[in-house]
Amino acid sequence: MIYETAPAKINFTLDTLFKRNDGYHEIEMIMTTVDLNDRLTFHKRKDRKIVVEIEHNYVPSNHKNLAYRAAQLFIEQYQLKQGVTISIDKEIPVSAGLAGGSADAAATLRGLNRLFDIGASLEELALLGSKIGTDIPFCIYNKTALCTGRGEKIEFLNKPPSAWVILAKPNLGISSPDIFKLINLDKRYDVHTKMCYEALENRDYQQLCQSLSNRLEPISVSKHPQIDKLKNNMLKSGADGALMSGSGPTVYGLARKESQAKNIYNAVNGCCNEVYLVRLLG
């Protein structure tokens, strides 16, 4: 048996630069991880089946699950003769902008690499994972990074300054492809990636909070105004900075002090079913 944790990610910044010939957007984003984790265990099987065990019936256990597809890809890549049972203890909200599915897929690639003693490097696993998900390369490493291209080009950055993170997911799901289809590249939107990069270089917490920006946020807010209300609630309740992560709908707030973080948590806990008080990992 092999055990892996799969931490959630948040975006400090997210920008889309242009539409590529392959249909994807060229992106530029800075991401980090928080200590909200899915936990996965892996067992070899005597047959060649891939079995995903998960308690939540709203999470698929077939080829629609990224962990299943990662296992399928890994077994094909390394021509394995055995299947695997993957048990997922899910804590990261689904369709939330926190890369829960990608984190599980990355954990699966790392876990199977150990389970079958393949000895592949993290770089090799990241390249393999990029075939099925743009956030998977980042999730292979779980380090604060600037991600460009489709997300597969990674430059590691300093860990962010220590801070509390309040995550709040409204009771709705958002499809990332649907949001990306609505991007208007002719419409100006300032994303402060350079400012964020410098803030992390200098471990400047205040500058980091000022740099939080996401080009997808106004698009998701136009469809779901409660996202903006949630963000404003966090800021009014004392968050040093707040932002929608990914394509949403999860909003997070940053706080240096535990008492400050608990105040924000209590302020938003009544309006969202899923609220978490966690720490930055990076």
Curated annotation (Swiss-Prot):
InterPro entries linked: GHMP_kinase_C_dom, GHMP_kinase_C_sf, GHMP_kinase_N_dom, IspE, Ribosomal_Su5_D2-typ_SF, Ribsml_uS5_D2-typ_fold_subgr
Domain of life: Bacteria
Pfam family, one: GHMP_kinases_C
Catalytic reaction(s) noted: 4-CDP-2-C-methyl-D-erythritol + ATP = 4-CDP-2-C-methyl-D-erythritol 2-phosphate + ADP + H(+)
EC number of the protein: 2.7.1.148
Keywords associated with the record: ATP-binding, Kinase, Nucleotide-binding, Transferase
Keyword ATP-binding: yes
Annotated ATP binding sites: 93-103
EC primary class: transferase
Catalytic residues identified in the record: 9, 135
Signal peptide annotation: none
GO molecular function: 4-(cytidine 5'-diphospho)-2-C-methyl-D-erythritol kinase activity; ATP binding
UniProt-listed Gene3D superfamilies: 3.30.230.10, GHMP kinase, C-terminal domain
A Gene Ontology BP annotation from the UniProt entry: terpenoid biosynthetic process
Transmembrane domains' residue ranges: none
Family note: Belongs to the GHMP kinase family. IspE subfamily.
PANTHER family found in the cross-reference section: 4-DIPHOSPHOCYTIDYL-2-C-METHYL-D-ERYTHRITOL KINASE, CHLOROPLASTIC (PTHR43527:SF2)
Function per UniProt: Catalyzes the phosphorylation of the position 2 hydroxy group of 4-diphosphocytidyl-2C-methyl-D-erythritol.
Name of this chain's protein: Putative 4-diphosphocytidyl-2-C-methyl-D-erythritol kinase
